[in-house]
Every structure is written in structure tokens, then in C-alpha cells.
């Protein structure tokens, strides 16, 4: 029996042009990508896959994500919206491309712009077929219908397709006895047609059969499988019970409170304390003492880690995914790096390490223990030796750079972070593509970094800071709220 995907693929591949414009819609994991990949393998005609990318500034560009032309292909090309139709026609004319197929990915995103650009391409390529692929969206479907675009839904999987997807590549004992209609219905509800989740269900069932040495499962074992597939209903029920109990307890306590207030004394910790206004502290910073390990302990605290001074060394940083960086640099260079750092001040005849947390127009805030000192620029630079020690967050795998030779997980993380930072809605890829390099350059340009497409120290620092997972150097006085603020020179 042919699956629905195979039937749709057969219909799309018909030699006779029974369709000109088609919108193939389905949920994530329903098989849209598989269909596009099968169509891309067609050796009898030219197949080009495009995707419209929109930056956080609202600028849009067409990217060629795939092209089955062996020579003179246009894969990884980037075109503006105005030139897309002309460039597409030029690319088809370079080879003998009769009845070409143009695939548009993620057509549910920015569909109005896609429709506008598509009209020009259709008029220039009268013998072409245009297949739009996206997710279900009533508004998008309504607009596509108005333009005469045929809608084809992958739809829900049948019971036969569900069972086939679960059993594919898995050696499961007695599948007919195990996968009852009730079980399949529950799995279908959890997986929502996502074949990757269905494959996970099959693998989980096989591993559980091997571990438990059984062909059938108890209700408890099925609940464990359902939780792996994303079923969190039992947790919600427990939370509801806990919340209900809490509300009842609070209500009873509130109702009984009035009978105790007249007889029981008020605890001292409930009596509001009148704030004491601290007198101005005019201590000389030269009298303050802090060791190097204490300064690094304070710097760890700025990053949100509580590390005792006796254990605060750089070799501990890797446990938090951090790394130490030290050297000599100008004040402006360290300000541009946008990270707090430890600076050594030569005050009189002694060396005092301080943690610089803010650099303003005329003053610098430094941490010394639990106190914050505000120093003038002129005085700070006159006593600072120019050295620094800072902490910075490396890649998820602990690397200082991410390149085309990095792991797929690192590249996927990088593109995901760039998409979030640039407000790009396309699906991230684990491949190092020219499109990824362009995203890197765009991110670097927007953060006033060197626009070289290289992901190193500065780019990683700003990526983590945009994600809110890195400490940063304050630039204004209002953000500092220490326990004690001491005015210094």
C-alpha cells in the first residue's frame, strides 16, 4: 500500500502539466522536506529551491538553497527581490531547462512578499511549475486560493502509515499485539504527524522491550513512553493538586489569623525597621587591601557564580563554560570588548587589584570586596598599570572559535543564535553555507565589530550578551546598585 506522501510525490512528478501553482502544506515533521528532496533528485528537468530571508531591519533577499544542475548551477546565490525573476530566468537559460520546477520553502512566512515576487517570475517563465511549501495557516491559505494556487495537504497519517513509521528500522516483537488502535491514537496525538517523533517512539519501544524482556507493556510503562514523546498531563494534574492545597491552606490561615493577632506578640522580624542613613564614607582607597584571588572571586560574582577566594583561580572557569583572558590593552580597547575586567592599580607603593564594572564619560566604577568606588577617568588611568584579566563565555562545546570545520551541533547553535539576534524566521541549518557567513557579517556590522565573517572572541561575546547569558560592562551610572558606594578620586 502506498503512503500518502508517495501518492502526492507521484502526482507532483507527473510528466503532463496538470498543475502550475501548488501550495503543499503540512505540520512540522509531516514529510514536506522529504518530498522536496525527492523532487530535487529529478534528473529529467531543472529543479531550483529558493527561500525568502528577511532580516531584523526588514530587508529581504532570495537565497538559492538547492539546484540540481551539475554545472553552471546557482546554489547559494543571493538575489534581491527586484532581481529575483530576472536572475532566475538567466540561471535557467544557462542550461537547457525545459519545464523547470521552482520550489519555494517556508512559504507561510512573508507570503505576501512571496506572492508579489512570484507573479513576475511566472510571467517570465511560462513553462515552469512553482511549488510552495509551508505550514497550515488559514490566512495564508485564503490568500493563496484567491491567486488560484492549488492547495495540497499532507494531512494526518492513517493507522497503517502510523504503524509503518513506528516500525521502520526497528525490530519490535509482536507489533500487532502491542500497537493497538488505542495506543496508535495516543501516539498520533502526541507526535502530530512528526515522523521524527514516531521514529523516537519506535526506538523507545524496542529499547524498553529489550530492557524489560517482555513483548507487552503495562500501563505504567506506556505512561513512561508517552512522557518521552511529550505528554506532561500527569505533571499538570500534580501541579493542580498542589496549587489547590496551597490555596485552601492560605484561605484557612487568613480566616483564622484574626483570632490570634490579639493574643500573640508580633515577632521581631516582622516589625519594620527604620532605614538608617549611612554617613558619607571618605576613606582613602589606598588603605583598602584585596588579594588577586579575592578580586577573581568578585569577578566570578559579577558573572553570577559564588566562588570562595581560596578557590578562585582561572582553572575553575572551565567548569562554568568560561575562560580567562589576560594581557595589556588601552582603556578604549577594553571598553569595546564590553566585559568587566580586573585592573591592577599602583596606589602609592602597593598594588591593588580592582574589578572594573562600569566606564562612563568621566568616571569609572570599580568593585573592591563588597564596596563600589567611583573614580575619575584621569586618576584611574594615572594609577592603572594597563594590564587586565577578564572572563568570557566560549562556545557550547568549549571552543574559542566556530568555523566550517566545527561540529554540526556548534554550527546549528550558531545559526539559531544569529536568527534570534537578527529576527530571521527561517529554519536553522547544521551546514556551513554562504548564507550563514552573510548572517555572521550582518550581526558583526550591527554590533560595530570587524565585519570579516569569522566567529571568534568578540562575536561570541556579543552573541552570548544578546542572549542574556553573559556579563557585560555597564556604560551608565544608574545601573550600579552596590551595598556601599564610596566616592574616590
UniProtKB/Swiss-Prot annotation:
Signal peptide: none annotated. PANTHER family: GENERAL SECRETION PATHWAY PROTEIN A-RELATED. It comes from the Bacteria. The gene is gspA. It is a single-pass membrane protein. The chain crosses the membrane at residues 237-257. GO terms for cellular component: cytosol; plasma membrane. Keywords: ATP-binding, Cell membrane, Membrane, Nucleotide-binding, Transmembrane, Transmembrane helix, Transport. GO terms for molecular function: ATP binding; ATP hydrolysis activity. Part of a cryptic operon that encodes proteins involved in type II secretion machinery in other organisms, but is not expressed in strain K12. It is found in: Cell membrane. Its main location: membrane. Induction: Silenced by the DNA-binding protein H-NS under standard growth conditions. It holds the Pfam family GspA_C39-like. Belongs to the ExeA family. May play a regulatory role under conditions of derepressed gsp gene expression. It comes from Escherichia coli (strain K12). ATP binds at residues 26-33. InterPro entries: AAA_22, ExeA_AAA_ATPase_DNA-bind, GspA_C39-like, P-loop_NTPase, Peptidoglycan-bd-like, PGBD-like_sf, PGBDSf. The keyword Oxidoreductase does not apply. This is Putative general secretion pathway protein A.
Amino acid at each position: 500500500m502506498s503512503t500518502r506522501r508517495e501518492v502526492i510525490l507521484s502526482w507532483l512528478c507527473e510528466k503532463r502539466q496538470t498543475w502550475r501553482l501548488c501550495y503543499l502544506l503540512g505540520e512540522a515533521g509531516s514529510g514536506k522536506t522529504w518530498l522536496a528532496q525527492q523532487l530535487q533528485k529529478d534528473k529529467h528537468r531543472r529543479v531550483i529551491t529558493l527561500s525568502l530571508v528577511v532580516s531584523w531591519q526588514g530587508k529581504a533577499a532570495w537565497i538559492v538553497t538547492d539546484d540540481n544542475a551539475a554545472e553552471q548551477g546557482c546554489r547559494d546565490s543571493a538575489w534581491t527581490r527586484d532581481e529575483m525573476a530576472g536572475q532566475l530566468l538567466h540561471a535557467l537559460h544557462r542550461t537547457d531547462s525545459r519545464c523547470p520546477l521552482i520550489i519555494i520553502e517556508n512559504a507561510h512566512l512573508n507570503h505576501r512578499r512571496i506572492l508579489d515576487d512570484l507573479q513576475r517570475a511566472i510571467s517570465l517563465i511560462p513553462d515552469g511549475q512553482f511549488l510552495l511549501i509551508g505550514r497550515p495557516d488559514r490566512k495564508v491559505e485564503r490568500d493563496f486560493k484567491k491567486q488560484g494556487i492549488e492547495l495540497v495537504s499532507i494531512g494526518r497519517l492513517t493507522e497503517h502509515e502510523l504503524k509503518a513509521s513506528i516500525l521502520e528500522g526497528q525490530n519490535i516483537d509482536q507489533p500487532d499485539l502491542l500497537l493497538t488502535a488505542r495506543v496508535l491514537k495516543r501516539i498520533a496525538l502526541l507526535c502530530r504527524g512528526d515522523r521524527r517523533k514516531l521514529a523516537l517512539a519506535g526506538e523507545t519501544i524496542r529499547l524498553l522491550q529489550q530492557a524489560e524482556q517482555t513483548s507487552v507493556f503495562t500501563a505504567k510503562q506506556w505512561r513512561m513512553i508517552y512522557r518521552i514523546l511529550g505528554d506532561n498531563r500527569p505533571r499538570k494534574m500534580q501541579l493542580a493538586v498542589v496549587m489547590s492545597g496551597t490555596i485552601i491552606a492560605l484561605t484557612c490561615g487568613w480566616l483564622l489569623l484574626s483570632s490570634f493577632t490579639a493574643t500573640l506578640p508580633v515577632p521581631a522580624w516582622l516589625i519594620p525597621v527604620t532605614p538608617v542613613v549611612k554617613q558619607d564614607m571618605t576613606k582613602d582607597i589606598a588603605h583598602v587591601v584585596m588579594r588577586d584571588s579575592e578580586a577573581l572571586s568578585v569577578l566570578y560574582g559579577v558573572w553570577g557564580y559564588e566562588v570562595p577566594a581560596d578557590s578562585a583561580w582561572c582553572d575553575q572557569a572551565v567548569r562554568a563554560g568560561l575562560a580567562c583572558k589576560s594581557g595589556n590593552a588601552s582603556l578604549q580597547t577594553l571598553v569595546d570588548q564590553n566585559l568587566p575586567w580586573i585592573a591592577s592599580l599602583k596606589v602609592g607603593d602597593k598594588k591593588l587589584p580592582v574589578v572594573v564594572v562600569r566606564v562612563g564619560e568621566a568616571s569609572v566604577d570599580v568593585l573592591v570586596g563588597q564596596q563600589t568606588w567611583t573614580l575619575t577617568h584621569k586618576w584611574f588611568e594615572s594609577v592603572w598599570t594597563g594590564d587586565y584579566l577578564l572572563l568570557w563565555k566560549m562556545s557550547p562545546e568549549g571552543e574559542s572559535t566556530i568555523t566550517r570545520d566545527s561540529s554540526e551541533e556548534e554550527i546549528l547553535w550558531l545559526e539559531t543564535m544569529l536568527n534570534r539576534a537578527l529576527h530571521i524566521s527561517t529554519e536553522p541549518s547544521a551546514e556551513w553555507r554562504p548564507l550563514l557567513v552573510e548572517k555572521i557579517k550582518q550581526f558583526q556590522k550591527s554590533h560595530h565589530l570587524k565585519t570579516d565573517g569569522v566567529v571568534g572572541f568578540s562575536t561570541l561575546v556579543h552573541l552570548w550578551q544578546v542572549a542574556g547569558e553573559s556579563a557585560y560592562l555597564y556604560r551608565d551610572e544608574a545601573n550600579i546598585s552596590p551595598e556601599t558606594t564610596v566616592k574616590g578620586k
